[in-house]
């Protein structure tokens, strides 16, 4: 159910290297407080009134109760969402992370205004049926289409958003849909990583029992100042 070896390599820093996880300093302080990192994105929020929301929060609570919870910063429940297509973020101003028609020095406000104009009238599928496939490394729930047809619809939606926004990333096709529950703040020892893997299995088992499938949508264009809040600008349904 979970790629344990990849998770251990990530949690210990062997996969990416560096003194600390990439989110520290860019998205969060060393203590887990959010820092300013404005941008826009296209997402599906998880309905707070849904059984799926309660199941995700319960899985997050299992992780919070672990002995290594302080190594993570956990997302507020009302920010839980699944990204359809990543937009722009202020600290990532490179040609492969920025709309091809915009100068790299364009402000986030200008980039967001451009995105809203390009997506006006863009109609996404209204609902997406997805299923959880794993809890990876104690911080993210891997998601996939509930069926092959649903997975194909998700991928076609990503492709359409890529083309509308003129934002072509080299890793576009390898993207794994997910719901982020937390961010890692420090590298772990292998023993600590193994403990997180076991806790992730426990959380995944409970999550799959409570939420074998969920429906998300409609898609939204959202803006953010930090990773704690994603404000809807518009639905992508007309």
What is the predicted role of each segment?
Residues 1-238:
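Histidine-dependent nucleotide/RNA phosphoesterase domain, centered on the 2H-phosphoesterase fold
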